[in-house]
Amino acid sequence: MIVTTTSTIQGKEIIDYVDIVNGEAIMGANIVRDLFASVRDVVGGRSGAYESKLKEARDIAMEEMKTLARQKNANAIVGIDVDYEVVREGMLMVAVSGTAVRI
């Protein structure tokens, strides 16, 4: 399945706009573990532990969105948007959305 942030797919014609699709993932973070990880992993302002959690949440949300598009018989998703939110202390949410299309 082609997934893109753009509204078109180069070299392909969009035959049908099917529906808006989305996916969400909320990940809990272990405060004590993450505190030690941040002390250990922060290099140049980056934390490997948090980046890993964000990637995992993004992958889950993307797969959920693709599954929904497939269920609607779409074969591509255009115009995707990825949002990150802190739901509450220790909870990270990743939400993705886009337009399911047939090419």
UniProtKB/Swiss-Prot annotation:
**What Pfam family does this protein match (any one)?**
YbjQ_1
Q: Which family does it belong to?
A: Belongs to the UPF0145 family.
Q: What is this protein called?
A: UPF0145 protein BC_5181
